[in-house]
Amino acid sequence: MRNSVKKWGVGIAVFAAIVTTAVLLPQDKVTDFHEKYEGTDLTSDIKGMERAGTYIRYIAGHDSSVRPQENVNIELFDYTSAKDVERYTSYEGVDEALYTGVDSTVTWQINVPQSGYYNLYTEYLIPESRGVVAERIVYINGEIPFESARNITFSRIWTDGGEVKVDNQGNEIRPTQKEVFAWQKAYFRDDRGYEAEPYLFYFEKGINELTLEAENEPMILKSLELKSVQDMDDYQAYLEKQPGVNMTETGTSYQQIVQGEDSTLRSESSLYAKYDRSSPTTQPNSVTNTVLNYVGGEAWRSAGQWIEWNFEVPEDGYYNLMIKARQNYARGSISSRSVYIDGEIPFSEMKEISFEYENDWNCMTLTDEEGTPYQFYLKEGTHTLRLEATLGGVGSILEELEDSIYRLNQIYRKLLIYTGVQPDKYRDYNIQQVYPEVIEAMDLESKRLYKIVDEMVAYSGQKADNIATAQTVAQQLERFVKNPNKITLEFTTFKDNITALGTASLNMSATKLDVDYFVVSGINAPIKVEKAGAMAKAWHEMKSFAASFVVDYDAVGDVYEEGDEGVIKVWILTGRDQGTILKSMVDDTFTPDTGIKVNVEIVAADALLNAVVAGRGPNVVLSVGADQPVNYALRNAAEDLSQFSDLQDVLSHYTASSYEQYRLDDHIYGIPET
């Protein structure tokens, strides 16, 4: 009896301890490191460890409050020197335009009426070329003002090259992408996204020289000017400038759903429509067929990338905006977007809207801090909504982190010269005496990193794995300062931690996001918030599981019965995107021209051998290793291509060395893949 009572007592005590821990743990405050860097001037530099040429230093070199209010137009054809340029007349609706080629350098003399900071602004068109962004280097009075002015980028415009097709299995096939050659307006900005605002360029009063040098891609300029720096209106100022209207019930109850996959324009060809079967609330939805139902994903990750949609409103008035999006890529991170309506950010709050980490879709109405929906004034007719990836508040933190990584590499290189790659752990290098500035730099950099950790945690609300790397380096530097003898013992680890910090910085600059749809609605229209419950998710998984027994997810495009005469089975060992492109090319040209039907299937590389042994292999396989054709030929499992009379015609497109590895005893068993 006593043993039973004793056991019950121990059990109750353990249970009480668990409950107490569960209650108290959530109340713990997230500790910060402010005590480590408070009172320290983190802007100071250690001689020999500073980073020159940064944008922050450039801005600090002049009075940033001097911002003239007058724009300065630059006459494009009044250049003082130029190379690889041409004057166009009557081009794309413009009377005159200046073509600047891939090797171009153009210099203008500008009479600036007042000293101060200006934005550089241009209207441009990128003609047909390699399909990548255009890049220009900016010189002011013969000098590059700051390092990142070496890489000013200008995006292209892409759209769908046709309608969405449906194969004979009911699967949607996305159209190819084609480029749109149209005029665009752009400020000169930070292509990394660290600076959310356009770059500020300082010009002295009087005659100044401005030079644009091409890094790649031609550009055609319609206009170029120095724009006065203007502060954007906040929401209240925006509302005060809008007219008062009496909307009818048609307008106040209006609602239009625009699917994410129906975007009209995009900045890169990779931002096309995708399909998702993971959530029951994705619209439209199918567990058996490939249905294009969202846009974004891994490709929509870099600052400056944008996607644009068209929408309509029935009358002049005020409308709300809701975006159904998902950020399930990085726990502890925030993906941000700038909202443009008809090419302009309507008010300052739309410079950055944030999507926090969540496994499922999040229906987010654009609201103020109190939860009141923003009202956007729109005139009757068609409008555009553009979402542009931005780093937002995290950009300045990442800029500090990049500077810190640069200085850490300087510290490492200085020590490397002295100690070598593998320091002798039994030798006292007296680093604190030989390089006292290195110890001082380590102490300062440790405090800077602690501050960066605090800033990132304050921004995101939690400490993610990537920023924890910065804390690891800060703690290591702190150990080095307290005991310099540890430097040589942990030298390899120090190098690895710097590398890991660089990787973490790249990961944190990725701002991925999916968009299912957005809703434009009148101010009285109810907005349905879709959220999948446990039962809906369970039913969705059951349907997906059942479908896996009857649906061939490996097949791509139109599928023909293998018993049909003249059907060729082709296996491709890469991804579905490559398979879809191949199947589209086959169906568009090869099958109509030859009458030969082709089934394309996506197959794992390790399945090929088993299939061949079982007698169920393909007629053609693509993307195999270079050694495989001969390996299969040795076992009489590959076809000798030498028997075909037109083989030499095919091989004439290749150099002999490219297919020599597929030769065995004067027979050819494979063709290079291009």
Question: PLM ranges: what are they?
Answer:
Residues 4-11, 19-519:
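Extracytoplasmic
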Residues 109-111, 127, 227, 310-312, ...:
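Structured segments of extracytoplasmic/periplasmic soluble domains
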Residues 146-147, 347-348, 599, 640, ...:
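A sequence-level detector of short linear motifs
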Residues 524-566:
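Disordered inhibitory propeptide/activation segment of secreted metzincin zinc metalloprotease zymogens
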Residues 546-564, 628-674:
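Hinge/lid segment of periplasmic solute-binding proteins
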Residues 564-632:
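Early extracytoplasmic/lumenal segment of secretory-pathway proteins
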